[in-house]
């Protein structure tokens, strides 16, 4: 009897262990192989929704983990060659189809199959021809996959090549035909790369394609789209190598009007258009996503921690953290002051690896650990060490770990002394690092591709029109969203409860209901209330945007349109 019981217990333990291992394995999605189910998209009867589902499936297959809550491709050093490629089947209304091979380590198109023949870009990895399209007759194309080479062979730039369903339908038919026209091959591959790979990388680009499908109109890439395509590696590197919310190098994008957009911080609103990053390195001591298996994380490249950026710190009403009157004597107060036209010492702060924040070699220091204590400049060696330590969170909060209090600009007046306060995610407690502290001006697209529009103190959705001032919004360093018609008015939830309408109210109080975070899931998130902006009942005719718990449906998805 005892032996039987022991045997039963042993079997149960083995079963539970195996089950636990199996369940744990499910936590980590396997890297896709070209033998897995092919992702498909057809232009026949295509809708913006079917295209969205295709892009979401492609993103999911390409995702290897999360860094700073943003999906990232697998680290190339952890991917076996046999698992390096996935295939996408594209078909058109004439029932012609091709398969496209994509490298999971960079989301590049490396080859395509047309019937019994396959064609590999000149710079395709050597292993691509081994693992992609077995049993086909293989050919090497005369050009590589870079836009520079593709444009040379196409005798057209990306700006000159139309995108949309008609262009994709033609691309499928032409490549399926096996015609030997290299110029047209290059042109059609530019179409496919942008409508698949680039759309998987950026929400902005997938949105442009989706609008094109919904309206039945072709489009050419605008300057904003091209600048995103040209800076994917830079944006990915900026996010992953960021120190205390700050990029190691500015990333210069372009607006649709060809105005420079300087992205220098994780909390910059444009980072939210990234849907999928190139893997560059793992941030040191970062909390890794559960998608990343521990052994893989340990083998992955770790970002350098030696970088110590010197930057401005922008906050309430776009003012800068400033050493009062350029005085560096111990105990001199720190104030909020208009950011100067030139970079000057008393508004420049070095974010040190020891968690101190220094100006002219002296430390930003809290006078004490009670709410309301003022913040001062102090000699780093003689100050109480814990009073000089700060963490800058991805959401723009600057916190003193010892006290758990946050940096706050309680006064709306220029020259107001900065203090530490209980963290309530107030607008006056929001900050953004970087030397470009100007508001980012953009339109904001939402449900049914309509744009957010100010109408007096009300806010609703209307047909997008770049020329309408009512649809232009200034996104400030404090997390506020302001109508460019009157930047003293902020988007504000009337109350802290579900269903509260979003309206325009005076920014002067710096409330929590006026601080917003653009997230990579497409939501505009209120940190204090843990809710997001929501088009009421998914019905723009109600002319009401409300506060609502996040569920991820289309009426909660927003996008800055540069």
Swiss-Prot record:
The residues bearing each 1-alpha repeat, given as ranges, are 317-359
Q: Which domain of life is it from?
A: Eukaryota
Give start and end residues of every 2-alpha repeat.
448-483
Glycosylation (residues): 234, 395, 435
The keyword Disulfide bond appears for this protein = yes
2-beta repeat extents: 487-526
SMART domains under this entry?
RICIN (SM00458)
Q: Which CDD domains match?
A: beta-trefoil_Ricin_abrin-like_rpt1, beta-trefoil_Ricin_abrin-like_rpt2
Where's the active site on this chain? 198
**Which biological process annotations from GO are given for this protein?**
defense response; negative regulation of translation
Q: Which residues form the Ricin B-type lectin domain?
A: 307-434, 437-561
Q: Map the 1-gamma repeats onto residue numbers.
A: 403-435
For this protein, the Enzyme Commission number is 3.2.2.22
Task: Pinpoint the residue ranges of every 2-gamma repeat in the record.
Answer: 529-562
User: Which GO MF terms are attached to this record?
Assistant: carbohydrate binding; rRNA N-glycosylase activity; toxin activity
- The disulfides recorded in the entry are 281-303, 320-339, 363-380, 451-464, 490-507
Q: Hey, what's the signal peptide range on this chain?
A: 1-34
The yes or no answer to whether the keyword Cell division is present is no
Q: Give the reactions, separated by semicolons, that this protein catalyses.
A: Endohydrolysis of the N-glycosidic bond at one specific adenosine on the 28S rRNA
Q: What does this protein do?
A: The A chain is responsible for inhibiting protein synthesis through the catalytic inactivation of 60S ribosomal subunits by removing adenine from position 4,324 of 28S rRNA. Abrin-a is more toxic than ricin.
- Tell me its family: In the N-terminal section; belongs to the ribosome-inactivating protein family. Type 2 RIP subfamily.
Domains: what does the record tell us? The B chain is composed of two domains, each domain consists of 3 homologous subdomains (alpha, beta, gamma).
Q: How does it assemble?
A: Disulfide-linked dimer of A and B chains.
The name this protein goes by in its record: Abrin-c
